[in-house]
Amino acid sequence: MTEILITTPFITLQQALKLSNIVQSGGMVKLYIKNEEILVNGLRTTQRGKKLYPGDELIIKDQKIVITTKANEN
């Protein structure tokens, strides 16, 4: 499992994919989302601008990514 720590209220799917090193650039995101199944909280999404909030979970190619904030760390 990978965690993405954010300090803002939300992050977009595009930003999350870049921060987790799944894609290298914003231009690659559109193609990646079109060609790969991405689940956000169990639902397939194709919206690169989808807002992700702390506690949201992404599943991409059997890799789990969780959005967190400092408040969620124990």
Placement of each model-derived feature along the sequence:
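Glutamate identity and glutamate-enriched acidic tracts
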Residues: 3, 36-37, 57, 73
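A basic, amphipathic helix-loop patch mediating RNA/tRNA/ribosome contacts
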Residues: 8-54
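C-terminal structural segments of small proteins and small subunits
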Residues: 47-74
